[in-house]
A protein has these predicted regions:
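Active-site acidic carboxylates
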Residues: 105
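Bacterial N-terminal signal peptides
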Residues: 13-26
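N-terminal secretory signal peptides that target proteins for export/translocation
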Residues: 1-8
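Hydrophobic H-region at the start of alpha-helical membrane spans
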Residues: 11-14, 71
C-alpha cells in the first residue's frame, strides 16, 4: 500500500524533528547507565556526597537504597535488583560472596568506621566515659540491634569489655539501624546512644560525643562487593574504582572514617 504525499510529508517532518532532538543530546547521554546501590545506614550521608561527585564525572545516575546491613543482605538474597552492596561490616559481603548473588573476587574494605557515645543531654556534658554508663540518672541507652547492625555488635563488645553489660541491660533500647539510634539520641528520646562517628559529623555536630578506645571493640571494617545484577554494568565497576581511590578516601576522612 502506497503512502500518500501528505503522509510522506508528515513522516518526513516527524523524522526531522526526532533528528533535531537527538542531536541536542550529547552522544554519550544516549547510553547513560544507571546503577542501584544498597548502602548501610551509617554511610548514607557520605554516600550522597560521593553520588554527586561520581555523577559529575560520569553519565547515568546512582539510586540509593539504605538500611541496616542485615536487612540489605536479606533483600539481596530475596532478589532486590541492586548492583553494589556497601555494608557496615565484612560478614554480610562474605556470605554473599559464597552465593550466586555476588561476584567473587570483587569484595574489598572501603572504610573502617568509628564507634562513639553520643548524647544531647546537657547533664552529661561534663561527665566522663565510661563512668556515666552506670549512673542512676541514665535510663535509656541506645544501640543498634546486634542481630543485624554491625555497630550494635561493636557496642555489645564495648559493654562486655567494660564488664557493665549485665548492669545496664535493662536500660538498653535496640534500634533497627545505627542511624535510627543516632536520631533517637539527637531528638532526646535516649539519654545516650552508641553511634557511628560519621552520623555525628554529618548532622551539624549537635550535642557531644565521647570517643571509645579502639581496644574495647573489634575494628568495624566496612566491605563493598559487586552484585550479580551489576556484573555487566560499566558504571558499577567504575564506581567501585572511584570508591577505592585516594581522593575518595580523603573525602571520607572528613566523616570520621579511618584507613589502614
Amino acid at each position: 500500500m502506497f503512502l500518500t504525499r501528505s503522509k510522506l510529508k508528515i513522516n518526513f517532518i516527524l523524522l526531522y524533528l526526532l533528528l533535531i532532538f537527538l542531536n541536542s543530546i550529547p552522544f554519550k547521554h544516549l547510553f547513560a547507565e544507571d546503577i542501584y546501590i544498597g548502602v548501610a545506614s551509617n554511610f548514607l550521608t557520605p554516600m550522597k556526597a560521593l553520588k554527586e561527585n561520581f555523577e559529575n564525572i560520569n553519565d547515568g545516575q546512582i539510586f540509593i537504597s539504605s538500611g541496616s546491613s542485615g536487612s540489605l543482605y536479606s533483600q539481596i538474597i530475596n532478589g532486590a535488583p541492586l548492583d553494589i552492596f556497601l555494608s557496615a561490616d565484612q560478614n554480610q559481603p562474605k556470605k554473599l560472596e559464597k552465593t550466586a548473588k555476588a561476584i567473587k573476587g570483587t569484595r574489598f574494605t572501603y572504610a573502617t568506621g568509628k564507634l562513639v557515645v553520643y548524647s544531647t543531654k546537657k547533664f552529661l556534658f561534663g561527665q566522663s566515659f565510661p563512668q556515666f554508663l552506670t549512673s542512676n540518672k541514665i535510663n535509656y541507652i541506645g544501640i543498634g540491634n546486634p542481630e543485624y547492625v554491625p555497630y550494635g555488635r561493636a557496642a555489645i563488645e564495648v559493654l562486655k569489655s567494660l564488664k557493665v553489660i549485665k548492669e545496664i541491660s535493662p536500660k538498653l533500647v535496640l534500634g533497627k539501624s545505627v542511624n535510627q539510634v543516632f536520631l533517637m539520641s539527637f531528638f532526646g528520646n535516649l539519654d545516650l546512644g552508641f553511634v557511628s562517628k560519621a552520623d555525628f559529623l554529618s548532622n551539624n555536630e549537635k550535642g557531644k560525643i565521647w570517643e571509645i578506645p579502639q581496644n574495647l571493640y573489634s575494628p568495624i571494617k566496612q566491605d563493598a562487593i559487586l552484585l550479580k545484577n551489576g556484573e555487566k554494568k560499566n558504571n558499577a565497576i567504575l564506581f567501585l574504582k572511584f570508591l577505592s581511590s585516594v581522593r575518595t578516601k580523603e573525602d571520607l576522612k572528613r566523616f570520621g572514617y579511618v584507613f589502614d
